[in-house]
């Protein structure tokens, strides 16, 4: 009779696994050390600790416990004519504290490689406030006049060279489109001009529908959002001035549902065309910024918009047609 000692076998397996793990770890460390020496890769760690203390005279329409303020809540009178929303509110928060890692010094395919990883404690949704949230995570390949960036970055309609300077963290929302999403971005430079093409999806900032805010509607359309922009930037260091201007357009299609309420396959989609034009002039003592936005179904960028059912083509099967809300 042969008896298997399972405890002994498990101990031997653990020892073997530990040895293999140590060897792999040592190999990875050696490989990374060699790569750093070869390419002189540098990691720059940064971030900050931020505390916000605020008091509002009335209730607000906002996110993250009042931290991301949109606008004051409307008047809501009770039977006695007293405004329910005329109730003060305050909060103390540290959720904007941020950590960041910038990577430089690598080279591949004759390109300079850089990257950025940034996170805060804002949370993706109101229920998970105070939890770690990914903000930016991308790799950039630079060939001089051509750049390729892939990863999570600012949405195309948020121009980092020209956005509102505000006291509140909302940065101009819901008028100014705001958000970050996964994307593939190609930039071609022509002197002071830049031609930019972007394919983007949705993550934390997503379209809204019957299932709430989710990137599923865009993914089910089978195609990412496409953006094309032209930027111009001129900097005069001697005079201390900077001039930036540009235009852009994007188009996306979402599929609000793949099955009707009566169980039939749904193929209806809704498209949306967006446009932006911007200008900034900065001098030593003043800065002027002008921006114009046109949007169709832009609820995914924290702006006023969305879509609606414009027609019921088959009441029995539940087929409908959609139209975007224009902003």
Task: Cite the ranges covered by each PLM segment.
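Outer membrane beta-barrel
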Residues: 36-65, 75-205, 222-223, 227, ...
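Surface-exposed loop/turn segments flanking beta-strands in extracellular/periplasmic regions
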Residues: 64-77, 310-317
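Detector for outer-membrane/organellar transmembrane beta-barrel domains
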Residues: 228, 240-327
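Bacterial Sec-dependent N-terminal signal peptides
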Residues: 1-33
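Active-site-proximal beta-alpha loop/turn segments in soluble metabolic enzymes
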Residues: 167-168, 203-217, 255-263
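Low-complexity, intrinsically disordered short segments enriched for Gly/Pro and polybasic residues
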Residues: 1-8, 199, 208-209, 243
């Amino acid at each position: 009779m042969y008896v298997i000692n399972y405890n002994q076998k498990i101990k031997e397996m653990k020892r073997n696994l530990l040895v293999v793990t140590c060897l792999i770890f040592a190999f990875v460390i050696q490989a990374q050390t060699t790569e750093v020496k070869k390419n002189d890769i540098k990691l720059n760690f940064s971030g900050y600790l931020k505390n916000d203390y605020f008091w509002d005279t009335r209730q607000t329409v906002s996110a993250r416990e009042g931290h991301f303020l949109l606008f004051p809540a409307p008047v809501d009178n009770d039977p006695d004519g007293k405004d329910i929303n005329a109730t003060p509110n305050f909060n103390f928060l540290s959720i904007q504290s941020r950590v960041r890692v910038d990577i430089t010094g690598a080279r591949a395919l004759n390109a300079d490689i850089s990257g950025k990883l940034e996170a805060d404690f804002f949370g993706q949704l109101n229920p998970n406030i105070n939890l770690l949230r990914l903000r930016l995570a991308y790799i950039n390949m630079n060939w001089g006049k051509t750049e390729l960036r892939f990863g999570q970055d600012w949405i195309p309609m948020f121009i980092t060279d020209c956005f509102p300077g505000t006291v509140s963290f909302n940065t101009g929302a819901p008028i100014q489109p705001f958000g970050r999403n996964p994307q593939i971005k190609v930039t071609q430079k022509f002197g002071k001009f830049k031609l930019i093409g972007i394919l983007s999806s949705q993550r934390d900032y997503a379209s809204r529908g019957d299932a709430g805010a989710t990137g599923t509607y865009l993914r089910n359309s089978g195609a990412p959002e496409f953006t094309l922009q032209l930027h111009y930037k001129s900097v005069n260091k001697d005079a201390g001035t900077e001039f930036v201007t540009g235009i852009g357009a994007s188009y996306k299609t979402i599929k609000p549902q793949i099955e009707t309420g009566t169980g039939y396959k749904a193929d209806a989609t809704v498209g949306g065309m967006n446009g932006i034009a911007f200008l900034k002039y900065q001098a030593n003592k003043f800065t002027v910024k002008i921006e114009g936005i046109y949007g169709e179904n832009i609820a995914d960028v924290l702006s006023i918009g969305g879509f609606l059912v414009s027609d019921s083509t088959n009441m029995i099967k539940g087929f409908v047609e959609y139209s975007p809300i224009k902003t």
